[in-house]
Amino acid sequence: MKKFLIIIFGLVLTINAQSKVGSTAAPFLNIGIGPRAIAMGTAFVATSDDITALYWNPAGITRIGGNSAMFNKTSWIADINYNWAGAAVQLGDLGTIGLSVNQLDYGKMAVTTNAEQDGTGEYFSAQDIAIGLTYAYQLTDRFSIGGTAKYIQQKIYNSSASALAVDIGVLFNSDL
């Protein structure tokens, strides 16, 4: 019994130790897409049935009801622009494929140093981008499954970082 309690205690400690690891990587991926989803307070994963399902739940693109595309540009403060584009094509009994691109462009910024705080005359830019390829399949009239493979890149001045990610989603329509 004592060994069992020690093992449980050790497992609980390791769960808490990882709670904030990586919590700041690619935060631009948390910016929601689509007016309907945003109006619902981003509670859209279970109801995703339009082209924005490429962002919210890849399984949802099976519910679009045809081929679809959407382009979105949001101008934020300080010349920051957020762009999103997505397209999905239904392949009949083979499923549905989609492509999406998220881009956050911070615009041009002046290079400053401790000695030249008003700027050196040089400018640099920063940009985040994610490109996703999605496949979804409707297993039954109520149940769909889908996945997205993403390439993510963040650039600022002369530095960049990139990663690969996978999103997997299921969608069950209960008709309630």
Regions found by a protein language model. Give the residues of each.
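Sec-dependent N-terminal signal peptides
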Residues: 4-15
